[in-house]
Amino acid sequence: MNYNAQVLRSFLTRLGYRAADVYQEFRFAAVDQPSRPVRQVDAAAFLDGPASYRTAALGVVRTDANETVQQTVEATRSLGAPFLVVIEDDEASMWTYTASGVTQLDSTSASQWQTLLADHKKFGPGPIRLLKALQVREDVPTTGLLFDPRTLYGIQASTQLALDELLTQFLSHFDGARTTAGQLSLQTHYEVLFPLVFRLLAGKILIDREDNRISSIDPDDPRQVVATVETLYSLSPQRLQWTKARVTQLASAWLALREGLYVRNVAADDLAFVYENTLITPETRKAFGTHSTPYSAADYVIRSLRLPEGNAAAQLRVYEPFAGACVFLTAALRRFKELFPQSWTVDKVHEHLVSHFVASEIDPFACEIARLALILADYPNHNGWRITRENLFESNHLADRVSQCDVLLCNPPFEDLDEPIEGLSIHKPVVLLNTVIKTPPAFVGVVMPSGFSTHKVYREHIRHICEIYADVEVMLLPEGVFRHASIGAEVLIAQSRRGDSIIGEGSSDESTIRKSIVRRTDWSRFTQTLKTSSSDVTQVNPRTSPGLVALRPLRRIWDYLAESPV
């Protein structure tokens, strides 16, 4: 059988994959298995760098002696490749992953394994890229190849759980209940420890990915790892007195991190969720009104927007006020990488992103964490992210920033202003809505307080939004999904700005309005599939049916009575 490293690389590059994106003996963590073992495929092709389950396209592997073909396929799910060729003895078979499980697509003799992937119109980078780009308003995959891109959200959920456990274990070495005199304590030194976590995570990524930029250092020395990461990404050195007790403490924590989850195939932007999920403190939430954004909610918003592709996507300016750890911006970063011209180099994409993606945040600590999160999300590129520390409720900052963006994404604080400011509502969410109505961006995705769609405080704002945009959705999220906050929330998604020639939509007098609901019992499913529990959709004329009136529970009864003779 013609099956060796050179043949594998040559075949995958002929399909259209860049040589730099084809790997032999690629190792990855099987995050969907309890022990998260490190698995290996003989070859893997990726859409672009860095290699991760999000960019994986194809895999080729031989079965282990103690596994069946189906067991091998199931154990390889976390690679993230839509298609896997498995060779067992004299037979080769091709498999894919669906929402209901693994599915065999074809088979042939082992000597003819290349014929299973020979059609570049199906298995080249372009078709695979489209296949993995999930649109949440599509009920079923648009391909005849069966692969369901929602499968990737199952991998994402498993990955984020594994990362949470990894970092919780790391931070346990700094638990004040366990530390001794002179050691670092999470309760006392969290403003030092949290940035340290990100520096060490970046170092672990570089080490697990065998990055040449870190190959010359001693990987067992965490302080050397931190110093190297700070140099690579132009980060300010941490000022901390390293006593013998602290050095010993850090070495023990770093060992747990080093020997924990193998992160080579982890999508770097998954690490951005760590701040809001694992690192946000009750003190920070109380001081700045921070309520962490579920990553799946941010993904749902981004993938609900009908963003243009190619050069048109490159014209859009994206802004996240009240950014926290930039969960929305990192989700947008991932989506826009799918939309940019495929001819763009990695350097070109990075250069464009740092000039068109900006954020604002009042918490200085969150600003640093957000910048570190974006650095990790944009691995292996350099720094350059613009995270401005500012109080957006002062000096008309919010209005100025929103007027300059095309895509507005955020989770604002829900609290009232401490003191009244002339010209502004005392309710912070209302201030944001007033700004959107005054200078409406082309695309809007913002989190609002629970009751937004029904409370009289927001009635006029919703009416204006439905007049400005021809496509409006409100998604209701259950209580308990915002970490460190017991309240639920509603997400406003607005697009198809009327009279917008660039987007090419919104010229009709009618609007499409949606009300989607995610029930508490369905939250786990939503995080893995982005499927809501229910969605009510209708077409209305916003002048005769203002706001969300058409989606009220008794709408169909009133419509029937209006059309029926008495």
Predicted regions and their residues:
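Well-ordered alpha-helical segments embedded in enzymatic catalytic cores
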Residues: 71, 296-301, 431-435
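Structured loop/turn residues at beta-strand edges in well-structured enzyme cores
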Residues: 79, 269, 313-316, 352, ...
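Residues that flank catalytic or metal-binding motifs in active/ligand-binding sites
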Residues: 353, 388, 488-490
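Short, basic/polar, glycine-containing "phosphate-handling" surface segments that engage DNA
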Residues: 2-200, 253-269, 470
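Conserved SAM-binding loop
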Residues: 370
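Signature of N6-adenine DNA methyltransferases within the class I
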Residues: 4, 82, 86, 91-95, ...
